[in-house]
Amino acid sequence: MTIETAVVQTPLGPVTLYARGGALVGLEFTDRAARRAALERRLRRHLGRFELREVRDPAGARSALEAYFAGDPHALSGQQVELHGTPFQLAVWRELRCIPPGRTLSYAALAARVARPRAVRAVGQANGSNPVSLFVPCHRVIAADGGLGGYGGGLARKRRLLELEGRTVA
C-alpha cells in the first residue's frame, strides 16, 4: 500500500500530511522529527505496512490548508478523512467536525453530545488522539471556564487557530 505525503509550511510551522485513496489519514505539526515518527508508527498500527510517496497535494489537503491560512475558515470542512479509532473516539471526532469555524464547545458539552456526559476526561483523551487535527477541529474544544484547555500542537497554536477563525479566548 502507498501513502501519499507532503510537508506544508504554514504560519504555525511545518505540517506533514498523509493520505490514501483520496482521504486524509494523518496530519501532524512536525517541527520536531519525533512527532512525525510517532504519527507514522500510529498509522502503521492502524493501516499495516505501507510505503510513503511524496506528492504535492495529498487528497487536496495542501490546497485546503493554504486556503484556510489565507483567510477561508471553512476551507477545511469538506476534506475527506479516513479515521481509525475506538467507537468512542470516532463518535467524538464526528462531533468535532460539526463545530463550525468561529465557535467553540467545552469538553463537558462535547461529552454530552456523544451521550457520555460524565466522560469529560475521555473526551479530552480522544481529542489528544485525533490523527487529523485541523481537519477534525479539536482546537475548537475549550475548558468549561472559557480557558484554552489543552492542545497537542501547543496552546500558542490553539490560540492562533481560534483567532484565525474569529474567536478570542482568554
Please identify what each model-predicted range represents:
Residues 96, 121-129:
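Major-groove recognition helix of helix-turn-helix-like DNA-binding domains
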